[in-house]
């Protein structure tokens, strides 16, 4: 029994969506397969993306004992005025800068920790 591929394709072209859906279900049942697209290993890709993170948010978690020094450091890092910098410090935990490089984030963290603040990089 030879297959006439062109005849099958022509017959599929003339079929309705419901008929084609029934055909897919019948093929799935008969051959034990699924028409669903295979899903790539998303868990592994997600872990790689987290390990290779290239932009960070610098978050001031706690201000410590030296509030004035922390405010000065925040002003230096962010370029904000005294009132805005004080507002960020008073409302800790707060995000100081977003989408910064790893090196820049580490530098900011070091400056703030030097004056007694607790900083998280996210």
From Swiss-Prot:
Q: Which GO terms describe its biological process?
A: translation
Per UniProt, the keywords (alphabetical) are: Ribonucleoprotein, Ribosomal protein
- UniProt-listed Pfam families: Ribosomal_L12, Ribosomal_L12_N
Q: Which InterPro entries does this chain map to?
A: Ribosomal_bL12 (IPR000206), Ribosomal_bL12_C (IPR013823), Ribosomal_bL12_C/ClpS-like (IPR014719), Ribosomal_bL12_oligo (IPR008932), Ribosomal_bL12_oligo_N_sf (IPR036235)
Gene3D superfamilies to which the protein is assigned, alphabetical: 3.30.1390.10, Single helix bin
Q: Extract the GO molecular function terms from the UniProt entry.
A: mRNA binding; structural constituent of ribosome
This protein's record includes keyword Ribosomal protein: yes
One CC-aspect GO term: cytosolic large ribosomal subunit
Q: How does it assemble?
A: Homodimer. Part of the ribosomal stalk of the 50S ribosomal subunit. Forms a multimeric L10(L12)X complex, where L10 forms an elongated spine to which 2 to 4 L12 dimers bind in a sequential fashion. Binds GTP-bound translation factors.
Q: What does this protein do?
A: Forms part of the ribosomal stalk which helps the ribosome interact with GTP-bound translation factors. Is thus essential for accurate translation.
Q: Which NCBIfam families match?
A: L12
Matches recorded under HAMAP family: Ribosomal_bL12
Q: Which family does it belong to?
A: Belongs to the bacterial ribosomal protein bL12 family.
Q: What is this protein called?
A: Large ribosomal subunit protein bL12
Please report the organism this UniProt entry assigns to the protein.
Latilactobacillus sakei subsp. sakei (strain 23K)
């Amino acid at each position: 029994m030879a297959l006439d591929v062109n005849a099958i394709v022509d017959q599929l072209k003339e079929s309705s969506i419901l008929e084609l859906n029934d055909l897919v279900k019948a093929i799935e049942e008969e051959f034990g397969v699924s028409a669903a697209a295979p899903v790539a290993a998303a868990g592994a890709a997600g872990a790689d993306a987290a390990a290779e993170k290239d932009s960070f948010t610098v978050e001031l978690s706690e201000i410590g004992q030296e509030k004035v020094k922390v405010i000065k450091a925040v002003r230096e890092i962010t370029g904000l005025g005294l009132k805005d910098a004080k507002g960020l410090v008073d409302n800790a935990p707060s995000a100081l800068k977003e989408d910064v490089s790893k090196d820049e984030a580490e530098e900011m963290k070091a400056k703030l920790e030097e004056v007694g603040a607790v900083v998280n990089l996210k």
